[in-house]
Structure formats: structure tokens, C-alpha cells
Amino acid sequence: MKLVQDKITIITGGTRGIGFAAAKLFIENGAKVSIFGETQEEVDTALAQLKELYPEEEVLGFAPDLTSRDAVMAAVGTVAQKYGRLDVMINNAGITMNSVFSRVSEEDFKNIMDINVNGVFNGAWSAYQCMKDAKQGVIINTASVTGIYGSLSGIGYPTSKAGVIGLTHGLGREIIRKNIRVVGVAPGVVDTDMTKGLPPEILEDYLKTLPMKRMLKPEEIANVYLFLASDLASGITATTISVDGAYRP
């Protein structure tokens, strides 16, 4: 059984890491997938990789400025107009920052909040415009275990992800009357480019504290997205699912 057969799906941050793993998994399960990336070059590279893996499937790609509601709405609207609807929006794009409170700059803090919180808000807002009349849809937001427990390695990232969790829970309660579900996923330490970009000493400390003695694979997070986007999760909304291997920052 293909869990998301013919579901029109957009994945931000879909060119690598968790987002790219989700794109592959959703295609394999019958979805019509569009990916958003940071640059058009990055998007084109990912599209070429997906075309090689799934030559019979059409995948669309865009590189909107996620901090601009108009830019995100234009890209989301293009997808919805082409297929006649939007079923699943996965707001997965984000950046990290590892400055502690006493050293974080105002500019860096504003930047991570703009991308990680405003970017998710803009994606959710745009998706809602395409889902509200049909009274159906699922919005999935990537949070983080650090948004629940905080982190000693930095203040900006966990603050932004706590914002994503608050947005998810509040929006989920507000728009369930339109039969639109909103769910967060809070990964632990995942083996992605973002994690590999951490300072070696921080990554080493992370690995020492992992109860599973390994980082999670992007596919393990994508599996949860697939379930949440499917009709099997029809009763789940306004909550955040932790996929953290018992890790606590």
C-alpha cells in the first residue's frame, strides 16, 4: 500500500538531508512532489538526482526566499495551480547557530529567527491559503528536540525551534475546523550536512551523549513524515512528535 498515493506534496529544504530523504520516500509512496531549496543551482542538482532515481516521475523545484511571504506564496501557488490542489506541506528548511547567549550577535539571532520561524510561518500561511477551501490538508513542521529541552551549545537554534513548536500547536488548534492538520516533528541528532557542519568538539560531545550510540538517519525522520502525512494519522494534530533516540541535549 502506498501511503500518500497522488498526494500533492511540497517539501522545503528538500534538496538535501532530511528533506531529500523525504522527497525520495514520498515519491516511492505515490506522491507528486515539489522541492524548495536555497538556490536554483542546488534545486537543479537535486532534481537531476531525483530524475535519475525516478525517471518516470515529474518533480518540480523552486528556490523562493522563505523569509518573504509573497515569494513563498508564489511558489506554493504555482504548485497548487498546476495540480489543482495542495495536500501536504512539509516546512523543513532551517539553519543552525551555535553561539551561547553571552556571545550571540543581534544580527545572527534575527537571521536564525527569520529563517527558522518566519520561514515556517510563511510556508504554513501559504499552504493554508491553498487548503482552506478544500477543507483538507496536512502541514508538517520540522522542530527539534532542542526546542523542547534547550541546549548548552547555543541559544538561537533552540529558541527558534521552540517557536516552531508553539506555532505548530497553536495553528493546529485554530485550523482543525477546516479539517487541516498541523503536526511538528522534533528530531534529535541526525546525520545531515547541518550536523556535519557543527564544530568538531560539539559534535564529539553529542556523540558521547547519544543513548543509541549513533546519529539518526535522515530516513528515520522521513518515515515519520510519511506516516503523519498519510490517512493513518488522521487523528493527530496540534502536537509535536519527538524522534530523538532518547537523546536529551
UniProtKB/Swiss-Prot annotation:
<dbReference type="GO" id="GO:0070403">
    <property type="term" value="F:NAD+ binding"/>
</dbReference>
<dbReference type="GO" id="GO:0051289">
    <property type="term" value="P:protein homotetramerization"/>
</dbReference>
<feature type="active site" description="Proton donor/acceptor">
    <location>
        <position position="161"/>
    </location>
</feature>
<dbReference type="GO" id="GO:0033764">
    <property type="term" value="F:steroid dehydrogenase activity, acting on the CH-OH group of donors, NAD or NADP as acceptor"/>
</dbReference>
<feature type="binding site">
    <location>
        <begin position="190"/>
        <end position="192"/>
    </location>
    <ligand>
        <name>NAD(+)</name>
    </ligand>
</feature>
<feature type="binding site">
    <location>
        <position position="161"/>
    </location>
    <ligand>
        <name>NAD(+)</name>
    </ligand>
</feature>
<feature type="binding site">
    <location>
        <begin position="15"/>
        <end position="18"/>
    </location>
    <ligand>
        <name>NAD(+)</name>
    </ligand>
</feature>
<feature type="binding site">
    <location>
        <position position="92"/>
    </location>
    <ligand>
        <name>NAD(+)</name>
    </ligand>
</feature>
<dbReference type="GO" id="GO:0006699">
    <property type="term" value="P:bile acid biosynthetic process"/>
</dbReference>
<dbReference type="InterPro" id="IPR002347">
    <property type="entry name" value="SDR_fam"/>
</dbReference>
<keyword id="KW-0520">NAD</keyword>
<dbReference type="GO" id="GO:0008206">
    <property type="term" value="P:bile acid metabolic process"/>
</dbReference>
<comment type="function">
    <text>Involved in the multi-step bile acid 7alpha-dehydroxylation pathway that transforms primary bile acids to secondary bile acids in the human gut. Catalyzes the oxidation of C3-hydroxyl group of CoA conjugated bile acids generating a C3-oxo bile acid intermediate. Can use choloyl-CoA, chenodeoxycholoyl-CoA, deoxycholoyl-CoA, and lithocholoyl-CoA as substrates with similar efficiency. Highly prefers NAD over NADP as cosubstrate. Also catalyzes the reverse reactions; in vitro, the preferred direction of reaction depends on the pH.</text>
</comment>
<protein>
    <recommendedName>
        <fullName>3alpha-hydroxy bile acid-CoA-ester 3-dehydrogenase 1/3</fullName>
        <ecNumber>1.1.1.395</ecNumber>
    </recommendedName>
</protein>
<feature type="active site" description="Proton donor/acceptor">
    <location>
        <position position="157"/>
    </location>
</feature>
<comment type="pathway">
    <text>Lipid metabolism; bile acid biosynthesis.</text>
</comment>
<feature type="binding site">
    <location>
        <position position="38"/>
    </location>
    <ligand>
        <name>NAD(+)</name>
    </ligand>
</feature>
<dbReference type="GO" id="GO:0032052">
    <property type="term" value="F:bile acid binding"/>
</dbReference>
<dbReference type="InterPro" id="IPR036291">
    <property type="entry name" value="NAD(P)-bd_dom_sf"/>
</dbReference>
<keyword id="KW-0443">Lipid metabolism</keyword>
<keyword id="KW-0560">Oxidoreductase</keyword>
<comment type="subunit">
    <text>Homotetramer.</text>
</comment>
<dbReference type="InterPro" id="IPR020904">
    <property type="entry name" value="Sc_DH/Rdtase_CS"/>
</dbReference>
<dbReference type="GO" id="GO:1903412">
    <property type="term" value="P:response to bile acid"/>
</dbReference>
<dbReference type="Pfam" id="PF00106">
    <property type="entry name" value="adh_short"/>
</dbReference>
<dbReference type="InterPro" id="IPR050259">
    <property type="entry name" value="SDR"/>
</dbReference>
<feature type="binding site">
    <location>
        <position position="144"/>
    </location>
    <ligand>
        <name>substrate</name>
    </ligand>
</feature>
<feature type="binding site">
    <location>
        <position position="42"/>
    </location>
    <ligand>
        <name>NAD(+)</name>
    </ligand>
</feature>
<keyword id="KW-0753">Steroid metabolism</keyword>
<comment type="similarity">
    <text>Belongs to the short-chain dehydrogenases/reductases (SDR) family.</text>
</comment>
<dbReference type="GO" id="GO:0033792">
    <property type="term" value="F:3alpha-hydroxy bile acid-CoA-ester 3-dehydrogenase activity"/>
</dbReference>
